[in-house]
């Protein structure tokens, strides 16, 4: 392989420091910002999103300070198809998606990787907090970042062996505070820039408002049901609810009520008390295995069912393109559409999209 790399630059601190570290290692680097959407096309202001002109200018400033060529690649068509449309379709079907995983799967480590190959560059570099290593059998491994509070391996479980072999995560062995210190020492314009939060294309955290504005649809009110199927109130459209949600229900009860299930076919939302949210068996499809080519028999792992979840002990089995995890202890508010990610210590075994919960 050559020492030529494409640095995916968002305009934030982490990708800027990743670029600096790669230059320090002697790599021939070019900086690239992926233009994922035109803000006016999806009805948000530039101040509240990534891909804004400010972000592009921040990335350009850092690239130039590092004497590194810089380009903006327009991937907006793919982003609309592979991320936004999938995001909307999921909520319309009572599923809670993770668009960051789709963006990694279809854009950062697919479309950008293919563009890097066209430019005769062997590596894609990002500011993710994770690590890539190679085991004694020549298999590439995805590992947690040393800074567990910033670890992003959960949203990277979809990377293939081919992609991992051409991916570098320079920040995987440092803390966020160290990254900021480097940015400040180099005088980067974005050294004190706040970390990005929530979903990049959703303004003010209201994903349901975004969906209604983007699609032009009005999602009809429907019935809230209790666990026995009795009508106990009215909801404001199924896209506004996700499993485990308590806020915004507007239902009085002796104990707090939570969303247990969303059924777009009947246009109903089932509510339950907290003790009705627990489940032990989680099935995932569209799987990607990293540390092993397949899971034979039963495998003991720790597993996460959402990004901020602390991984828990489970026994996992594989059946074709699905995996089933049986947790030692019931887990709260496991949600279809999120990722089930398996860990062996700090190594990602693999994962998939949750399709069934019992």
Please annotate each region the language model reported.
Residues 1-157, 168, 177-178, 184:
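ATP-dependent adenylation/nucleotidyltransferase module used to activate substrates
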Residues 127-133, 139-358:
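AMP-forming adenylation/ATP pyrophosphatase catalytic core
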């Amino acid at each position: 392989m050559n020492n030529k790399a494409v640095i995916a630059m968002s305009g934030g601190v982490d990708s800027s420091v990743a670029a600096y570290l790669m230059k320090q290692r002697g790599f021939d680097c070019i900086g690239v910002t992926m233009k994922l959407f035109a803000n006016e096309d999806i009805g948000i202001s530039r101040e509240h999103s990534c891909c804004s002109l400010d972000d592009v200018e921040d990335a350009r400033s850092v690239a130039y300070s590092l004497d590194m060529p810089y380009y903006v690649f327009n991937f907006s068509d793919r982003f609309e198809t592979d991320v936004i449309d999938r995001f909307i379709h999921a909520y319309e079907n009572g599923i809670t998606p993770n668009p960051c995983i789709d963006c990694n799967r279809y854009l950062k480590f697919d479309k950008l990787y293919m563009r890097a190959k066209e430019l005769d560059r062997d590596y894609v570099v990002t500011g993710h907090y994770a690590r890539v290593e190679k085991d004694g059998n020549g298999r590439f491994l995805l590992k947690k970042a040393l800074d567990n509070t910033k670890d992003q391996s959960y949203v990277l479980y979809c990377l293939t062996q081919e992609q991992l072999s051409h991916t570098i995560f320079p920040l995987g062995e440092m803390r966020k505070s160290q990254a900021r210190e480097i940015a400040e020492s180099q005088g980067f314009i974005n050294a004190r820039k706040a970390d990005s939060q929530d979903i990049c294309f959703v303004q003010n955290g209201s994903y349901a408002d975004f969906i209604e504005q983007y699609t032009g649809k009005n999602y009809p009110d429907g019935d809230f049901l209790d666990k026995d199927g009795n009508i106990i109130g009215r909801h404001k459209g199924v896209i506004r609810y996700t499993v485990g949600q308590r806020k915004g229900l507007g239902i009085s009860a002796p104990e707090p009520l939570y969303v247990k299930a969303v059924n777009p076919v009947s246009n109903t939302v089932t509510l339950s008390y907290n003790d009705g949210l627990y489940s032990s068996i989680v099935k995932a499809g569209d799987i990607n295995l990293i540390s092993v080519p397949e899971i034979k028999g039963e495998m003991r792992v720790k597993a996460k069912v959402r990004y901020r979840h602390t991984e828990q002990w489970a026994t996992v089995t594989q059946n074709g393109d699905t995996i089933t995890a049986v947790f030692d202890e019931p887990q709260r508010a496991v949600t279809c559409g999120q990722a089930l990610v398996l860990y062996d210590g700090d190594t990602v075994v693999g994962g998939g999209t949750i399709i069934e919960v019992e």
